[in-house]
């Protein structure tokens, strides 16, 4: 005996139950991300599709570099998190899934969420086009309002999001450099899982206080004086003085010897930067499709992004920095902390 045409089959009911359980489970864990299954049309057309839904807020966040040096940044924040970050939360999605991003603007200027995806509806553009066409005008989010942006990624790799507003007498560039940017990692469903790390290179925003503010930053951090400042800290207080700067002014990424990482590097700034890490081959999975960058140096024009496959073969702290050396001297430095594979690596304080 068949089912009436208007009655879902047991299989479709099970799919809905599974989707409900997944939503309930993820919602209990995090208000930031929900993953669920969207039914097909039931008529043999569209198939069921996984939806990855993120919830973000745009908020003010003070980034304290110590010694009275503070950046009053604008940031994207995970709903439920204590404060925002620069860069904003990294969003992950797999080719074939739908990405939904719900954004609430909690600042006193209009802001938006613009990506470099393709093949999306104009209502998800998050630019001035939404205002002048009045199609999805709310995508340029007024203070206190929210908007949902939807995308369907077609190929894997690194993309990013940023504010596209020029509200409040500030330029689009100023909105971005004030901290409103973040990464989107699009995964290949046919590839095995791999560790992802995202590094943004940029100039710092305009709203700062203190006389030791880094002009150039990586992942929101910078140490004026660069590597020489690390030498001076060691001379003054030993390694503890150096370690006190870890993930405060100097970004540190800990990994194991032999561990493969995909390091996604983005130049979100208006200047030419370059990226170099010590003692590792810079295999380009994006721009060069698997070839190694000559000189193990990734050149980066403004807006450029690439994915580097890194596998360190020797333990130790290994520097990474902008190889426009004046930028490194001004603070654009970081460390890969590579440890022997004797247990789980932990991030330094």
Which ranges hold each PLM region?
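Intrinsic, low-complexity N-terminal interaction/targeting segments
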Residues: 170-171, 274-276, 282-298
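Secretory targeting signatures
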Residues: 1-48
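Short proline/glycine-enriched turn/loop motifs at strand-loop junctions of beta-rich domains
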Residues: 106-108, 268-271
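A short beta-turn/strand-edge loop motif at beta-sheet boundaries
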Residues: 112, 273-274
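Hydrophobic beta-strand segments within beta-rich accessory/binding domains
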Residues: 101-103, 163, 263-265, 275, ...
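N-terminal, post-signal-peptide metal-ligating segments of extracellular/periplasmic oxidoreductases
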Residues: 36-123, 127-128, 133-146, 179, ...
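Extracellular/periplasmic metallocenter environments
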Residues: 107-111, 118-121, 129-192, 298-349
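Extracytoplasmic low-complexity repetitive segments enriched in small/polar residues
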Residues: 87-89, 97, 196, 200-205, ...
